[in-house]
């Protein structure tokens, strides 16, 4: 009888808490409208742990693509390093896909720099999406939060990495740092490699990372490792002394699994607090 009562009590406790949802601490979701398309984009924002107590402090801002995937991942991976003082605290901002759209169609359209005839989906809105980030997202964050306009980091993966490379080559001063995970250099016959690149005038850090197994030999449709190395070479070619570049191959990682390591190691390289 006691065992039955205990089991019933445990079941009651479980059912009583089953509807409680977990929320990322100090986070909100807002909506911003892109002009002139009038598309609405949800934007996820997380403030650092010290934000409420250090009211005069201006924070670096980490900007992410693919918000539903990247926001919980980067928030979780940076929580302990930031809170324990081994990584600078920062505001995390993730731009999601167009409201009401399928994520795949939104990201393919917004993260690609050219209109690819071979694709059935709409492509080629990278310039427009870059303008949305520059003219709408940045002002909102910097006017409503204590986010730095001189210490911004971009983090993108796959097509998001391609989008970051496009911004690096066309408007490099938008961000101080670029983390390009498994960039889709192959898109539209490697067209990103033919983009006429603007040399950064300010100090810029570029972290390019790719999984060891992102090759056809391991089932990938494209050789992402070679593509990432070609992108590295292009970045080196435009460096006039302002670029600090790091290239990393994530051991044992595929396209599906490389990004968590790429993101946290890239952020540690940029914001890690080194012991003296």
Functional labels for PLM-detected ranges:
Residues 4-12:
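Sec-dependent N-terminal signal peptides
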Residues 30, 57-132, 136, 140-144:
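Serine-hydrolase catalytic machinery in alpha/beta-hydrolase-like enzymes
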Residues 156-160, 164:
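Gly/Ala-rich beta-loop-alpha elbow adjacent to hydrolase catalytic centers
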């Amino acid at each position: 009888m006691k065992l039955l009562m205990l089991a019933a009590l445990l079941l009651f406790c479980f059912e009583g808490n089953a509807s409680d949802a977990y929320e990322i601490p100090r986070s909100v979701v807002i909506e911003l409208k892109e002009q002139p398309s009038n598309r609405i984009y949800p934007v996820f924002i997380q403030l650092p742990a010290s934000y409420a107590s250090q009211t005069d402090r201006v924070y670096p801002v980490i900007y992410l693509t693919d918000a539903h995937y990247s926001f919980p991942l980067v928030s979780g991976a940076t929580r302990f390093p930031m809170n324990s003082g081994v990584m600078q605290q920062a505001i995390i901002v993730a731009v999601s896909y167009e409201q009401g759209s399928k994520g795949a169609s939104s990201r393919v359209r917004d993260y690609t720099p050219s209109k690819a005839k071979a694709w059935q989906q709409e492509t080629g809105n990278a310039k427009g999406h870059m303008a949305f980030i520059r003219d709408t997202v940045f002002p909102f964050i910097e006017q409503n939060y204590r986010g730095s306009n001189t210490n911004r980091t971009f983090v993108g993966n796959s097509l998001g990495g391609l989008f970051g490379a496009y911004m690096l080559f066309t408007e490099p001063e938008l961000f101080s740092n670029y983390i390009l995970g498994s960039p889709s250099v192959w898109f539209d016959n490697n067209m990103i490699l033919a983009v006429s690149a603007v040399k950064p005038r300010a100090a810029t850090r570029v972290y390019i990372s790719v999984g060891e197994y992102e090759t056809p030999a391991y089932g990938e449709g494209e050789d992402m490792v070679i593509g990432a190395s070609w992108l590295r070479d292009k970045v080196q070619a435009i460096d006039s002394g302002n670029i600090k570049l790091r290239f990393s191959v994530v051991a044992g990682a595929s396209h599906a699994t490389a990004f968590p390591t790429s993101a946290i190691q890239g952020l540690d390289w940029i914001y890690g607090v080194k012991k003296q």
